[in-house]
Curated annotation (Swiss-Prot):
One of its GO terms (biological process) is defense response to bacterium. It is found in: Cytoplasmic granule. Keywords: Antibiotic, Antimicrobial, Disulfide bond, Glycoprotein, Immunity, Lectin, Nitration, Proteoglycan, Signal. Nitrated. The lineage of its organism: Eukaryota, Metazoa, Chordata, Craniata, Vertebrata. Glycans are attached at S69. This is Eosinophil granule major basic protein 2.
Amino acid sequence: MKLLLLLALLVGAVSTRHLNVDTSSLQSLQGEESLAQDGETAEGATREAASGVLMPLREEVKEEMEGGSGSEDDPEEEEEEKEMESSSELDMGPEDVQCPKEEDIVKFEGSPGCKICRYVVLSVPKTFKQAQSVCQRCFRGNLASIHSYNINLQVQRSSRILNVAQVWIGGQLRGKGHHKHFHWVDGTLWNFWYWAAGQPWRGNNSGRCVTLCARGGHWRRSHCGVRRAFSCSY
C-alpha cells in the first residue's frame, strides 16, 4: 500500500515538472515572436522616417545653401518688393549723391584676369538703394557681387578695418512663394554664397536684401531700408 502511494506521488511530481517546462518554452517562444515583431516595426519606422523626413530635410538644406525657393511670403517683404519695383532704380538725384571721402573707404583689387577687378568698402551708412546709387554714380559700378571665398574674405577684412558690423552687398531676393531666388544687382551669375547658420530661410528671417557680417564674413537677410555701410564692385 505504501509502495503504491509512493509511486503515485512520483508520477504526479514528474507530470508537474513537464508542465512547467512546456509553459516556460511557450513563454520563451512568445517573447521571441514579440521581439521579432518589434524589430520589424522599428525597421519599418526607420524606412518611413528616411523617406518621409530625411529627404525633405536634405532638399531644404540644398535650397538654403543655394538661396533657393522659400514657400511662405512675409507681408513686410511683399511691401518692400512693391516699393522697390514702383520706384526708379536710382532713388537719389545727382544733387543728392555725395561721393565718400578717402578716409571713409577701403579699396582692394580682385584676382588677376577677373571680370570685376576692383572693390571698395564704404563706412557711410545708406539704405540698399541709396548705396546702389553711390556705387553707380561715384564708381560707375554696383553693390558688390561676390563670386569667391577670397573676395568675401577681403570684404570682411575691409569692414573690420572701418569698424562696421555689417555691409550691404549686391544680393537681393526676387519672386514669391516657391519662385523666390537671390540674384546680384549687376546681373552676374549667383554662383557663390556664404550664408550664416539658419539663413536664408529658416527661423525668423525676413528682408529682401543681403548683408555681409564683419564678424565671420557670413551673409544675412535684412530689410532694404536699414542704413548700413556697403561695398561696391566696379
